[in-house]
Every structure is written in C-alpha cells, then in structure tokens.
C-alpha cells in the first residue's frame, strides 16, 4: 500500500523480490535497495530458501 515516506533495505542472507509498481527486482545477499514509499510496493521471498534483510521505514509507520 502506498504511503508517505521512504524505505531502505539490506539483504543479509538469501534473496528477496522487490516489486515496485509493475516491475520486479531481485535483491541478493550483500545488496541494498531504496524507494519512495508513495507508490505500490511489496517485498517477498519467492524461493524455498530462507532470506533475511534489514528494513528501514521513514517515518516509522509500522
């Protein structure tokens, strides 16, 4: 759900899929991501392996 703010993340292990609007990006261990939260976004793990990441939201809405 779009909302005010910005979001940043860093993948610690595995890989995640970041969906921004209609585009999908795969982020792997050691990679980071950033986006303006005012558009549709989703973070998911589309594999059977575990994934861990740090997620920072500003302002802290959740």
Residue ranges and their predicted role:
Residues 10, 34, 55:
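Conserved beta-strand segments that form the floor/walls of ligand-binding pockets within enzyme
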Residues 4, 19, 28-29, 49:
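Generic detection of intrinsically disordered/low-complexity segments and helix-coil linkers/edges
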Residues 1-5, 56-59:
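Short beta-strand/loop turn elements enriched in aromatics
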Residues 14-19, 32-33, 41:
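Short beta-strand segments in beta-sandwich/barrel cores
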Residues 21-36:
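Short acidic-glycine-tyrosine-enriched beta hairpin
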Residues 28, 37-62:
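Ligand-binding loop in jelly-roll beta-barrel domains
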Residues 3-18:
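Short, conserved beta-strand element in jelly-roll/cupin
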Residues 1, 8, 24-25, 45:
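Short secondary-structure boundary/capping segments
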